[in-house]
């Protein structure tokens, strides 16, 4: 079947893993405590704090305790949705203030533009929140790449290593799974996507291969047919 849509991971695929771990996460860890204290009374933030309380089983946790839980989750690299949402809010402020610029590999930015010009629909699936995804591409070093994408998916669609998540995403995109190409640097994610019927392509930026999947080192090497 002809590929009509591309679903891409971010971390290690379109963007350097180091950007997330060496820039974004430390920025959020530094600024999140004060952000939560300043905005805890706002409905959007309060809802996420309640979600942290529910997830941690500490229904009566005060703001400082919730902050401690969030910082612990960051240290553990937990993929908790309320943490991702709050991080996204902190990053949004950083992008607005000009303190952050999203990293996107030049080869990825060029390929995404070319694919869009060819009429392919582009989507993102990342463990980072949808808001954070939009910020990375919308405020990137390569300019505003946001208009290239038709949709974004995060952990609200399910874990990235479960095939049901990819079936759900294919349904949301509205195409047969076999017409969607998924790009990732993680074998378990590629396996899950393949199990759901998607086409898969591994991206190994440092070279090598991703077991059981065709693999490239750069978006410049990707041929979409």
Swiss-Prot record:
Co-factor remark: Binds 1 Mg(2+) ion per subunit.
Keywords: Amino-acid biosynthesis, Hydrolase, Magnesium, Metal-binding, Methionine biosynthesis
Gene Ontology MF terms in the entry: 2,3-diketo-5-methylthiopentyl-1-phosphate enolase activity; 2-hydroxy-3-keto-5-methylthiopentenyl-1-phosphate phosphatase activity; acireductone synthase activity; magnesium ion binding
Transmembrane segments: none
Cofactor annotation: Mg(2+)
Highest taxon of the lineage: Bacteria
InterPro entries: Enolase-ppase_E1 (IPR023943), HAD-like_sf (IPR036412), HAD-SF_hydro_IA (IPR006439), HAD_sf (IPR023214)
GO biological process: L-methionine salvage from methylthioadenosine
EC number: 3.1.3.77
Alphabetized CDD domains for the sequence: HAD_EP
Claim: Nucleus is one of the keywords in the record: no
Reactions mediated catalytically: 5-methylsulfanyl-2,3-dioxopentyl phosphate + H2O = 1,2-dihydroxy-5-(methylsulfanyl)pent-1-en-3-one + phosphate
Metabolic or biological pathway: Amino-acid biosynthesis; L-methionine biosynthesis via salvage pathway; L-methionine from S-methyl-5-thio-alpha-D-ribose 1-phosphate: step 3/6; Amino-acid biosynthesis; L-methionine biosynthesis via salvage pathway; L-methionine from S-methyl-5-thio-alpha-D-ribose 1-phosphate: step 4/6
Family in the record: Belongs to the HAD-like hydrolase superfamily. MasA/MtnC family.
Alphabetized PANTHER family for the sequence: ENOLASE-PHOSPHATASE E1
Subunit: Monomer.
Function, in words: Bifunctional enzyme that catalyzes the enolization of 2,3-diketo-5-methylthiopentyl-1-phosphate (DK-MTP-1-P) into the intermediate 2-hydroxy-3-keto-5-methylthiopentenyl-1-phosphate (HK-MTPenyl-1-P), which is then dephosphorylated to form the acireductone 1,2-dihydroxy-3-keto-5-methylthiopentene (DHK-MTPene).
Protein name according to UniProt: Enolase-phosphatase E1
């Amino acid at each position: 079947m002809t590929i009509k849509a591309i679903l891409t991971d971010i971390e290690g695929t379109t963007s350097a893993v180091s950007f997330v771990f060496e820039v974004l996460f430390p920025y959020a860890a530094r600024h999140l405590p004060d952000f939560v204290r300043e905005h805890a009374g706002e409905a959007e933030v309060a809802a996420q704090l309640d979600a942290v309380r529910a997830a941690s089983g500490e229904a009566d946790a005060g703001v400082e305790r919730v902050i401690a839980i969030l910082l612990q989750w960051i240290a553990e690299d937990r993929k908790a949705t309320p943490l991702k949402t709050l991080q996204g809010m902190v990053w949004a402020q950083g992008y607005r203030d000009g303190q952050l610029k999203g990293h996107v590999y030049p080869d990825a930015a060029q390929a995404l533009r070319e694919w869009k010009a060819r009429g392919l629909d582009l989507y993102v699936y990342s463990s980072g929140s949808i808001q954070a995804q939009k910020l990375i591409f919308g405020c990137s070093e390569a300019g505003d790449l946001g208009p290239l994408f038709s949709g974004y998916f995060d952990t609200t669609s399910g874990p990235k290593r479960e095939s049901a998540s990819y079936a759900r995403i294919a349904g949301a995109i509205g195409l047969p799974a076999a017409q969607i190409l998924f790009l990732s640097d993680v074998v378990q994610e590629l396996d899950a996507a393949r199990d759901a019927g998607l086409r898969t392509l591994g991206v190994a930026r440092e070279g090598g291969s991703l077991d059981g999947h065709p693999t490239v080192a750069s978006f410049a090497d990707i041929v979409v047919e």
